[in-house]
Amino acid sequence: MKALTFPKSHRLLKPSDYSRVFNDVTLKVPHRNFLILASANSLGHARVGLIFSKKNLRLAVQRNRIKRQVRETFRLQPDLPGLDIIVLGRQGLDRLDNDTVRSSLNDLWHRVKKKYRQSTPDQSVGNPRGTE
């Protein structure tokens, strides 16, 4: 079993990482309170970046609470595909309680996985097992 940690290697750290995702969006998963943008990476694991503006979450306490929730739900998703993911906050996020935020994020992570599976071609179709 993998350790469910959140090391630096699972975060988008540089502005160039964010720019690459914004310029090459392959998956977009909308929600009333969040928007997830994702782009494939070659690392073999997912990385996440967070963008929560003062316009949508006025108080730093609110921004930090939501960011903690996003990081925690991301950390508990070890089976996410190799994607660079940006989570953007939308208006109305400050009115949600922690349980609602957590359930919304878990739903979004499942939608990301589902959309990724649908967008990538199945390798087993071209080469059925046992036939060579």
Curated annotation (Swiss-Prot):
For this protein, what is the EC number?
3.1.26.5
Q: What UniProt keywords are attached to this protein's entry?
A: Endonuclease, Hydrolase, Nuclease, RNA-binding, tRNA processing
**What Gene Ontology terms for biological process does this UniProt record contain?**
tRNA 5'-leader removal
Tell me what reaction this enzyme catalyses: Endonucleolytic cleavage of RNA, removing 5'-extranucleotides from tRNA precursor
Q: Where is the signal peptide?
A: none
Q: Which residues pair up as cystines?
A: none
A GO MF label: ribonuclease P activity
Q: Which GO terms describe its cellular component?
A: ribonuclease P complex
Family stated for the protein in its record: Belongs to the RnpA family.
Known partners and oligomeric status: Consists of a catalytic RNA component (M1 or rnpB) and a protein subunit.
What NCBIfam families does this protein's entry cite?
Answer: rnpA (TIGR00188)
Entry function = RNaseP catalyzes the removal of the 5'-leader sequence from pre-tRNA to produce the mature 5'-terminus. It can also cleave other RNA substrates such as 4.5S RNA. The protein component plays an auxiliary but essential role in vivo by binding to the 5'-leader sequence and broadening the substrate specificity of the ribozyme.
Q: What is this protein called?
A: Ribonuclease P protein component
Organism of origin:
Marinobacter nauticus (strain ATCC 700491 / DSM 11845 / VT8) (Marinobacter aquaeolei)
